[in-house]
Amino acid sequence: MQETDLSIIKTFKRLFPIIRNYKWGLIAASVALILNALVDSSLIYLLKPLLDDGFGKADNAFLKQMAILVMLFILLRGVSNYIASYCLSWVSGKVVMTLRRNIFQHLMYMPVSYFDKNPTGRLLSRVTYDTEMVASSSSYVLVTIVREGAYLISLFAVMVYTSWQLSIVLFLLAPIIAFLISIVSKRFRILSRNIQNSMGELTVTTEQMLKGHKVVLSFGGQKVEKARFDRVSNDMRRKGMKIVSADGISDGLVQLIASLALSAVLYVATFPEVMSENLTAGSFTVVFSSMMAMLRPLKSLTSVNSQFQRGMAACQTLFEFLDLKTEKNNGTKQVERAQGCITFDNVIFSYEGKEEQALNQVSFTIPQGKTVALVGRSGSGKSTIASLLTRFYDVNEGQILLDGVNIEEYTLENLREQCSVVSQQVHLFNDTIANNIAYAAKDKYSRAQIIAAAQAAHAMEFIEKLEQGLDTVIGENGASLSGGQRQRLAIARALLRNAPVLVLDEATSALDTESELAIQSALAALQKNKTVLVIAHRLSTIEKADEILVVDQGKIVERGSHEQLLAKGGAYKQLYSMQFSE
């Protein structure tokens, strides 16, 4: 058995337990599908007595009985079809929900480095397109195999029962069709995986345009984005046509073989030995109609392979993602509230896939309740230091201590509970203002505490002007708010959390001077009895810091108070002079 076949079997074995959780829905659907197939084949078999006894003998009473029987069969067919459709939709919906829940949950625990390497659009495609493909393929395959398989078997049984001599021709079909399926299976797997990759690229391209819509408009990039989208879209279309082509060729060959079998039946029927076996008009009609009816299930059972390969390719992608390691979380230490003493001890760090060191032997200590500011040019490593403190990334060498304990010994959840972070890149959720301020902890804080945090961040100034106040839904990422308003909500969120360690990464960069001065006073009150790490571009905001570290090319090149650094006349003095000469 080939390696690809083994991987498909392995993938299906992992998917089966998820489907098995909804076995009663599957059983009900399968029974209904089999019943549906039996009714269809029974309707064909009724042609024999209808032609031989009803019309052949002009028996009106028999014809009336047949009319009632046909009506009952049609009613039974409708009921079974409804049950099968409903149960399969229920199972399919449950499978999609389970897969999406597993993927979404796994995504939330993936390290930040994974998101650095994978575009958001590709991840969205995984949650939406791939999971839907698995569920739809599973439903289609089940319907086809159970209903069409049962229909094919029942039709063959009807044929053998009616005339085994004519039916013997069908035995020639099975090995030929099996051979065709084995040839195209590998091709379908490869093409299906290519389609998935193209769907991911299509989602990425669309997402980039939507997120950067203002940039596109400002720079007149419509033609560039259209060309990019057309290229990706056309690539996906071409790959889709390859699947259609392979599918069509295999279907055509199966139907050609089946047509030859039909011709053979007609030819065999001319032999006296066959005609002498009481082959009536009704019997021949049943056999011929059964063979014609077999074309549909034969075609479906042949094409089910392509759909199965698509589903398994998507499923394989999902399971490969679920097998990726989540954030390293081997620590066991938990504290209710840390004291807040932070030490960086000879920390060396480089981003994955890059040889250049983002931080090189960085060492400093922030005593409990003190404020340390990081300044330097863009890309010098300031934000990297903040990311390492919260373990968004792990150090390559050296260690980071919180209260004398390596931060890797804390559980991730407990470590991050000790830190309130306000970044220059504010993210808000499509929820109320109150829920955004008390994010992930709305039951922990009272309404009064939320209001107090908003007031301290000077956010109530604009919240009170909104019709629904704190209960206003602000849209995706706070689309209805200005940059400064969004930044104030992020500060209010950090104020409410009241963690012993406060990280301010350009926290006031989006505020006007007046608002910044007001919030600086609020932050000054907040910083009492807290350890504060400030990353600042505006040097005027960190003049009162207990210590200022000047970072350049991943190294700390200067350290001291504002006055001490100015007196040195080094890198800090140059930055200060550049800002205040503007």
UniProtKB/Swiss-Prot annotation:
The keyword Membrane applies. Its main location: membrane. ATP binds at residues 376-383. The chain crosses the membrane at residues 26-46, 68-88, 140-160, 164-184, 252-272. Keywords: ATP-binding, Cell inner membrane, Cell membrane, Lipid transport, Membrane, Nucleotide-binding, Translocase, Transmembrane, Transmembrane helix, Transport. Its EC number is 7.5.2.6. It catalyses: ATP + H2O + lipid A-core oligosaccharideSide 1 = ADP + phosphate + lipid A-core oligosaccharideSide 2. CDD domains: ABC_6TM_MsbA_like. One of its GO terms (cellular component) is plasma membrane. Residues 342-578 form the ABC transporter domain. Coiled coil: none annotated. It is a multi-pass membrane protein. It comes from the Bacteria. Pfam families: ABC_membrane (PF00664), ABC_tran (PF00005). In MsbA the ATP-binding domain (NBD) and the transmembrane domain (TMD) are fused. Homodimer. Belongs to the ABC transporter superfamily. Lipid exporter (TC 3.A.1.106) family. PANTHER family: ATP-BINDING CASSETTE SUB-FAMILY B MEMBER 10, MITOCHONDRIAL, ATP-DEPENDENT PERMEASE MDL1, MITOCHONDRIAL. This is ATP-dependent lipid A-core flippase. It comes from Haemophilus ducreyi (strain 35000HP / ATCC 700724).
